[in-house]
Amino acid sequence: MNIKCDMHFAVTGGAGFIGNNIVKNLVKKEHNVCVIDNLNTGKLENLKDVKDKIDFLKIDIRNFDEINQILKKMDGVFHQAALTDVQDSYRKKDEYYDVNVKGTRNIFESAKINNLKVVFAS
């Protein structure tokens, strides 16, 4: 028996290495996928195989209002967006804090408001 699960998922950082693999697996299972990525480190090329099967939004997770508007339409969120370069983090402490802490807080706050489950990798 082949059951189609028609759920809507957001994947933050979906154009990155881990995120794009999550996106491809969700698409393979016939879910509706919304990729949220600001493309600072992710690449659209990573999504070329599924570009016609996803919605892509170039949004920064630090923007709570935009994130909340998107997540209110979802059944769940896979949060993979982050800045990860260790050397760069020493030079850009404030930016790394804003993205990795405040941005992640935005995802969890919106998930709480919208009663969503979050899969988070750290």
Language-model segments: residues:
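N-terminal Rossmann-like NAD(P)+-binding domain of SDR-like oxidoreductases, especially those catalyzing
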Residues: 1-122
